[in-house]
Structures are given as C-alpha cells and as structure tokens.
UniProtKB/Swiss-Prot annotation:
Pfam families: BTB. Keywords: Ubl conjugation pathway. This is Putative BTB/POZ domain-containing protein At2g40440. InterPro entries: At1g01640-like, BTB/POZ_dom, SKP1/BTB/POZ_sf. GO terms for biological process: protein ubiquitination.
C-alpha cells in the first residue's frame, strides 16, 4: 500500500505544484477570455519540458528579459479547453481524463500545434474509439489539418462501411 501512495505522490507532483500555484512564472490565457479575462498560471520549465514550441517561445530574449509575469494568449482555445490542455501537460500522460476527453478535438489540434506528439497520439486513439455515423465526417476533416493517415483511414473506412457496406 505504501508503494502505491509513494507512486501517486511521485506521479502527481506536477499537478500538485500547479494546484498550489508554487513558484509560477507565466500565465496562459484562452482566446475567448478577452483583455481582462481569466488566466491560468503555470511554470515555464514544465511547459518547456512538454512542448518544443513553448520551449522556443519561452526562451526568447523578449520573455527572458521581462521582469513581470508574462501572459501568453492561446487564441485558438476556449478557457475550458485551455484548462484541459494545462491539466494534461501537468499529468503523468498515461491517459486522457474525462475533462480532457470532452475537449479531445481541440486537444488533438493543440498537440500538433504545440508539438506534443504524445497528446496528439492519445487524442487520435480517443477519436478513433469514438467514431460513429454522426461524427465520422468531422473526424475525417480533422485528420486533414495535419494529414494524419491513421486517423484519416479509420474515419474513411468507418464512413465507407457504414454508408456503403
């Protein structure tokens, strides 16, 4: 039992420092938050470790030289999607949470945009497992954003066999 507790403490460490807001040094804001909207505090080091795009962005001379808490707006995300994105970044990455599954489409796009291949892979698996007649065309379209052969083929064959099989 103690081993499981130790593992939980280890795996949940990043989520804990986010929840406690310890030593946060950057803010992320969703595109739908407006100028005075809510932002989510985070850690440059964690964002940089999870994403090459954040790493390049946060290592820029402009951000390094700033004495104030920098705010980065992720225009393409709504606030709830941003929360799910941050939740994933601070998680152990073993699976998508229920909250993350609710926003799987936007997280799939974010995984590609911010170069987090593992997030994109988990979202692809979730999208494929959730294929049904009502969303097959949407998923087929999503697979084109960056062309994703596995997602495309799954959606295409589902659609083809559902309607013509």
């Amino acid at each position: 039992m103690a081993t499981e507790t130790n593992k939980e403490l280890f795996v949940g460490g990043f989520a804990k420092i986010l929840k406690e807001q310890r030593q946060v040094d950057v803010r992320l804001k969703a595109g739908d938050s407006g100028d005075e909207g809510a932002s989510t505090s985070a850690h440059k080091l964690v964002l940089s470790a999870r994403s090459e795009v954040f790493k390049k962005m946060l290592e820029s001379d402009e951000i390094k030289a700033s004495a104030q808490l920098e705010t980065i707006t992720l225009c393409e995300m709504k606030h709830e999607e941003l929360e799910a994105f941050i939740e994933f970044i601070y998680s152990d990455g073993s699976m998508l949470s229920a909250k993350e599954k609710q926003h799987v489409r936007s997280l799939y796009i974010a995984g590609d945009k911010y170069e987090i291949p593992h997030l994109r892979d988990l979202c692809r698996i979730e999208l494929i497992s959730s294929l049904k007649s009502s969303n097959a065309l949407d998923i087929l379209e999503l697979a084109q954003i960056p062309f994703d052969k596995a997602l495309h083929d799954s959606a295409f064959f589902f659609f083809f066999f559902f309607f013509f099989g």
